[in-house]
Amino acid sequence: MGAQWKVKHKEAAANAKGRTFGKLSKEIMIAARAGADPDMNSRLRLVVEQAKKASMPRETLERAIKKGAGLLGESVNFERLTYEGFAPHRVPVIVECLTDNINRTVSEIRVLFRKGQLGAAGSVSWDFLYQGMIEAVPTAPDADADEAAIEAGAQDCEPGEEGATLFLTEPTDMDAVCKALPQFGFAVQSAQLGYRPKSTVDGLSDEQMAEVEAFLEAIDNHDDVQNVYVGLAG
């Protein structure tokens, strides 16, 4: 895994689609506070690209933008929280949340971490890199990912999912790299800031792996959890 944890099984993944839209809606609403026009709001533009890749219904996307921008007469008050700790078998985990009730979220996340270990700030983040992660697909048969990474200002690139390339950037460079990649034959599908592990835990048995995955799925299923990053090989 070694980065953002994702549901593996088809049935669970199908059930998670609604939760994915809910998480994206929160990100869109927060980004839209700075303006409802994606062309003038780079953060909103990147989240909208993620939403489109996830096949979020247009009506849902547009409502989230309007709500966040205050065009529907509703206030949006979410706070960002980050938790660090360990899943079973000392697998390092970083959990990002967006909540409208900090006390509720803190209490419920602590309960979920009882099968692992909730740590203090910095307890595992020292073993992760905070980076921009851009998924892009080639638009021409001769598009060269390594060359595009250098020319666009990315730190590195590696094969992504379904024929895409994952471009890695400094957090402050992500938007500029997104804008530059089309010049070098790559169309951006999604972009986000997140954590990548410097090292990963491996050698777990099937039974131990099942325990870790059950823990991660329970965390990811929480309504306030946006992203789960894990230092786990495989």
Curated annotation (Swiss-Prot):
One of its GO terms (biological process) is regulation of DNA-templated transcription. Gene3D superfamilies: 1.10.10.200, 3.30.70.980. SUPFAM superfamilies: YebC-like. The keyword Mitochondrion does not apply. Pfam families: TACO1_YebC_N, Transcrip_reg. The keyword Cytoplasm applies. InterPro entries: Integrase-like_N, TACO1_YebC-like_2nd/3rd_dom, TACO1_YebC_N, Transcrip_reg_TACO1-like, Transcrip_reg_TACO1-like_dom3, YebC-like. One of its GO terms (molecular function) is DNA binding. Keywords: Cytoplasm, DNA-binding, Transcription, Transcription regulation. Its main location: cytoplasm. Belongs to the TACO1 family. PANTHER family: TRANSLATIONAL ACTIVATOR OF CYTOCHROME C OXIDASE 1 (PTHR12532:SF0). HAMAP family: Transcrip_reg_TACO1. This is Probable transcriptional regulatory protein PSPTO_3162. It comes from Pseudomonas syringae pv. tomato (strain ATCC BAA-871 / DC3000).
